[in-house]
């Protein structure tokens, strides 16, 4: 239970707060969500952070992972021992279609998303009810950090969803879309983003809780697997047979496909606006890179992404935090930059530790062994920022 709570905090709670923060940061600024949220940062720092997020959500991790999840849950179960050899061919076909749709965005993507989302939710509801009514196995034995620090372990595992980074990326895009549609006032923008966040939070919570329950009743159903997709596949096969497994494969494949198109389009749009290349060239480049990255395999990609996410996620969390409390800073520009600098430095230490580097010199830091060395210094810096007095007040006292 503590692990599930920790996971939901970072995989559901933080994305919801992030969407609200994007709307709050845009209040009265007359600019897009990202520009408004990072207005106290140097332009180069805000741009570097945006580039890092779009690369992570684009060709480096999130987009290739959609193809890998589709492969693991959509095709590999039907290939048996030949599954590993089919990854290259599958990724070529999958991302070729993603590139084609991304090059010509239109009604196709809207139609697929419109009908796919309800179908996916119905399928997940059926799976959740099946797991509750007819669990297929027993509860597996907890091990490692799931015994010692389950709450923190759950929080760190929630990083892997990348949902907070996605909320920063798509929240800013939604603000821009609302502004283009003539919705300029803050109350309306706040309302729409909050409603969207609440709907997604409820849906994600239902999905994650049902998957937690599935994992807690999977002992004996499957053995010797190295990722969650294989567990879900084996469970569905045991619960519904090959027909249910086929339906799950089709829906997951389509869901991953539309996610890949959305991520690729958003990333290409951003870099098109940032650099001189055309949108189509960016789509082709990022699609090809996604093919290469996807062929490392799902488990390996997740392992490679963990140190990066451990380093960058605290920065995103701190950005959301200071967006809510910046009105309490006596010198908002100074405090804002100090908080982000501190969290970046300590987040990098956590990331290096997660990568397996020897970091004994920093073992004295509170929560360093838990991957949360950034937490206390960030909160302390934020508190000090609230104690700073405005220049005007100091000048008045001096006079």
Q: Predicted segment positions?
A:
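Membrane-interface loop-to-helix entry segments
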Residues: 101-131, 306-317, 338-343
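Hydrophobic transmembrane alpha-helices that form the core helical bundles
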Residues: 44-80, 256-272
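Hydrophobic, membrane-embedded alpha-helices of multi-pass small-molecule transporters
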Residues: 130-137, 145-211, 247-256, 341-351, ...
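TM-loop-TM module centered on a large, flexible mid-protein loop between adjacent transmembrane helices
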Residues: 32-39, 207-257, 273, 307-309
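C-terminal membrane-solvent junction of multi-pass transporters and transport-like membrane proteins
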Residues: 320-383, 394-399
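Hydrophobic alpha-helical segments and their helix-loop junctions in multi-pass secondary transporters
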Residues: 59, 121-146, 164-165, 213-215, ...
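Selective recognition of specific alpha-helical transmembrane segments in multi-pass small-molecule
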Residues: 9, 13, 17, 119-131, ...
């Amino acid at each position: 239970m503590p692990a599930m709570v920790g996971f939901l905090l970072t995989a559901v709670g933080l994305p919801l707060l992030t969407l609200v923060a994007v709307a709050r940061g845009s209040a009265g600024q007359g600019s897009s969500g990202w520009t408004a949220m990072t207005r106290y940062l140097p332009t180069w720092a805000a741009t570097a952070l945006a580039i890092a997020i779009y690369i992570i959500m684009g060709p480096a991790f999130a987009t290739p992972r959609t193809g890998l999840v589709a492969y693991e849950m959509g095709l590999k179960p039907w290939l048996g021992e030949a599954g590993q050899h089919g990854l290259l061919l599958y990724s070529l076909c999958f991302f070729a279609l993603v590139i084609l749709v991304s090059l010509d965005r239109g009604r196709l993507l809207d139609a697929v998303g419109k009908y796919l989302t309800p179908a996916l939710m119905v399928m997940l509801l059926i799976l959740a009810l099946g797991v509750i009514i007819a669990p297929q196995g027993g509860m597996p034995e907890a091990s490692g950090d799931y015994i010692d620090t389950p709450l923190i372990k759950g929080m760190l595992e929630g990083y892997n969803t990348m949902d907070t980074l996605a909320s920063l990326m798509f929240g800013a895009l939604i603000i821009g879309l609302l502004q283009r549609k003539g919705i300029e006032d803050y109350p309306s923008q706040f309302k729409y983003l909050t409603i969207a966040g609440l709907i997604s939070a409820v849906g994600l919570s239902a999905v994650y809780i049902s998957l937690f329950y599935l994992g807690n009743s999977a002992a004996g159903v499957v053995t010797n697997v190295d990722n969650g997709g294989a567990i879900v596949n084996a469970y569905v096969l045991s619960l519904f047979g090959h027909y249910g497994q086929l339906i799950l494969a089709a829906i997951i494949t389509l869901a991953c496909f539309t996610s890949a198109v959305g991520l690729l389009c958003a990333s290409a749009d951003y870099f098109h606006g940032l650099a001189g290349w055309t949108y189509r060239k960016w789509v082709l480049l990022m699609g090809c890179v996604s093919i290469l990255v996807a062929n490392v395999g799902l488990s390996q990609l997740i392992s490679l992404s963990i140190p990066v996410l451990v380093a960058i996620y605290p920065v995103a969390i701190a950005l959301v935090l200071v967006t809510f409390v910046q009105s309490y800073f006596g010198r908002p520009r100074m405090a804002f930059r100090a908080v982000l600098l501190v969290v970046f430095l300590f987040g990098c230490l956590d990331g290096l530790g997660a990568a397996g580097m020897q970091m004994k010199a920093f073992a004295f830091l509170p929560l360093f062994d838990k991957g949360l060395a950034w937490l206390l210094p960030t909160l302390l810096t934020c508190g000090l920022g609230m104690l700073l007095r405005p220049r005007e007040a100091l000048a008045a006292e001096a006079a």
